[in-house]
Regions:
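A glycine-/small-polar-enriched, mobile loop at the entrance of the PLP active site in fold-type I
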Residues: 1-29, 34
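Conserved PLP-enzyme active-site core in the AAT-like
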Residues: 10-11, 28, 34-168
């Protein structure tokens, strides 16, 4: 149905504006934020890949569990729930991992409400051969998120938080 494809194209165009990206592979999926996490990681992580997960709440823990199930060599950085990471310390950790393929971070941890600054991390890995995956389920449209400028390779969100849009 051409009308249906027109609606999908309009949604994708609108999402590119919200995500601040020109990436043509920007699309909506009928599913939860966790389905976005699973799709992103299942497409990016291969067995034995070196993955760094930043953990400061429930969804960082969930990313770690998923990466382990996919067979990745998982390293983590953790701060107590309710705290954010110092970006300079994260960059130092990244520098110490010469075989790092993927770094995963939650921009705004739903379980604690903590906002994680990610711009410096993204700018650092942008020109490296490191994939930057960001969970923006709670943050998209509520705080600044610049997918292209910050070098984010894979970013997922959900409609139920700051976008305030019903699913479907």
């Amino acid at each position: 149905d051409p009308d249906f494809f027109g609606i999908l194209d309009n949604i994708s165009s609108s999402l590119r504006k919200v995500f601040k990206t020109t990436n043509k592979v920007t699309f909506a999926v009928s599913g939860t934020g966790s389905s976005g996490m699973e799709m992103g990681m299942n497409n990016l992580v291969e067995s034995s890949d070196e993955v760094l997960i930043l953990k400061n709440g429930e969804f960082g823990d969930r990313m770690e569990n998923l990466a382990l199930r996919l067979g990745a060599k998982v390293s983590t950085m953790s701060v107590p729930w309710g705290h954010s990471f110092n970006q300079d310390k994260v960059i130092e950790k990244i520098k110490s991992m010469p075989n790092l393929k993927l770094i995963c971070v939650v921009q705004a941890e739903t379980s604690t409400g903590v906002l994680q600054e990610i711009d410096s991390i993204g700018r650092y890995v942008k020109d490296k051969d490191i994939i930057f995956l960001v969970d923006a389920v709670t943050s998209l449209s509520g705080v600044n998120l610049e997918v292209d400028a910050w070098g984010i390779d894979c970013c997922f969100s959900g409609t139920q938080k700051c976008l305030s849009v019903p699913p479907g």
